[in-house]
Amino acid sequence: MAQYSAEFKQAKVLVLGDVMLDRYWFGATNRISPEAPVPVVRVQENEERAGGAANVAMNIASLNVPVQLMGLIGQDETGSALSLLLEKQKIDCNFVALETHPTITKLRILSRHQQLLRLDFEEDFNNVDCKDLLAKLESAVKNYGALILSDYGKGTLKDVQKMIQIARKANVPVLIDPKGTDFERYCGATLLTPNMSEFEAVVGKCNTEEEIIKKGLKLISDIELTALLVTRSEKGMTLLRPNQEPYHLPTVAKEVFDVTGAGDTVISVLATALADGRSFEESCYLANVAAGIVVGKLGTSTVSTVELENAIHARPETGFGIMSEAELKDAVAQAKARGEKIVMTNGCFDILHPGHISYLENARKLGDRLIVAVNSDDSVKRLKGESRPINNLENRMAVLAGLASVDWLVPFTEDTPQHLIGEILPDLLVKGGDYKPEEIAGSKEVWANGGDVKVLNFENGCSTTNVIEKIKLLKD
């Protein structure tokens, strides 16, 4: 499938649906409350993530594709927090803020990797007049290549038929990840993406492939769909269209750690590819590959362009590619659970040269996984001067991601990655040059955790500064 690409130059996607804020409180539990027989959690850390339709938008943004998100929120602190979280990822938020309802929020309290309690703050939107939302949709939809309607049964899509008709009038394909058993309400959509359980709840038990195909085609006819994609867990996914052969894709997941949000990833990549002008077959292929990546991560996660490109071209050595700090912590936890030795290094890597290549190859040989932490553009500028970096962060990480020696990449904004190293706690911290181990940022944290620190030599004569000076001489 080398002709397929994860670069979506023309795509623009609009998402409308039930938006949520997922909050996580983490803490230690060492005693039982004297007030009631319940554990006392001393909260030490918290995290916020976009949920529901907002997670769909996050998936699209992670592919470097313009995305607008519409939905209903409250005029409250959580609505503001969700908007800020999304805007940081360059997602265009076009919400209707209600005085009468709170922003849907799910607060999870965890200790020792176990969820102790979930608190839901929500009221369904079935009694809300959605005329403002419909007006926003009608105004914006013509500017996008695909519309995703993300249904979590909270009421934002109570006028889903009107939404479908607005998109059809604008000749924009409508993709829906359905909720419940009333699929007739999605009549006229371009494509539905039910999982096998949702599909069988509507059409009845399917014991053979022939039954899946027959009942799927009947469903397409009954509710006037263009296509139906049934996601089937370990059996992959099956695309059905009238008068065309079924298109089946086996699963590409090597290891499954968590299926949370996999459906969001499938519909996000599918819509993005269709909006980019790809065929149904190519779009489903890319969505299937993306699903195989995301189920290998813990929690609600996204897939980057680099990860998708690597997976398409069968580059397993690059692992999960570019990650956030939270994603990296999950990936490291999984790798350590498998008994893998984690090596970590850091640098600017502004202009990659043979010295960098050999250094990273030597570092990789010291363990099973190599993490490379990369200075942000502002961090490089503070360290190297106003004329640096030559290459921006996105380009520097994209080049590093193509190296077989590099498993994971993570950016950091500080002058040193000391905080990041303290969070990741690799088994081995590596630095190139003439440092003493105790001078290396993060060494104390690694030693305190039982890890080791090692200094590697750079190749003589290889440096970014030398490369820049040679380029200046050529210009002169």
UniProtKB/Swiss-Prot annotation:
Keywords: ATP-binding, Carbohydrate metabolism, Kinase, Multifunctional enzyme, Nucleotide-binding, Nucleotidyltransferase, Transferase. The keyword Nucleotide-binding applies. It catalyses: D-glycero-beta-D-manno-heptose 7-phosphate + ATP = D-glycero-beta-D-manno-heptose 1,7-bisphosphate + ADP + H(+); D-glycero-beta-D-manno-heptose 1-phosphate + ATP + H(+) = ADP-D-glycero-beta-D-manno-heptose + diphosphate. Its EC number is 2.7.1.167, 2.7.7.70. Gene3D superfamilies: 3.40.1190.20, HUPs (3.40.50.620). The active site is at residue 264. Pathway: Nucleotide-sugar biosynthesis; ADP-L-glycero-beta-D-manno-heptose biosynthesis; ADP-L-glycero-beta-D-manno-heptose from D-glycero-beta-D-manno-heptose 7-phosphate: step 1/4; Nucleotide-sugar biosynthesis; ADP-L-glycero-beta-D-manno-heptose biosynthesis; ADP-L-glycero-beta-D-manno-heptose from D-glycero-beta-D-manno-heptose 7-phosphate: step 3/4. ATP binds at residues 195-198. One of its GO terms (biological process) is ADP-L-glycero-beta-D-manno-heptose biosynthetic process. NCBIfam families: cyt_tran_rel, PRK11316.1, rfaE_dom_I, rfaE_dom_II. Homodimer. Catalyzes the ADP transfer from ATP to D-glycero-beta-D-manno-heptose 1-phosphate, yielding ADP-D-glycero-beta-D-manno-heptose. This is Bifunctional protein HldE. It comes from Haemophilus influenzae (strain PittGG).
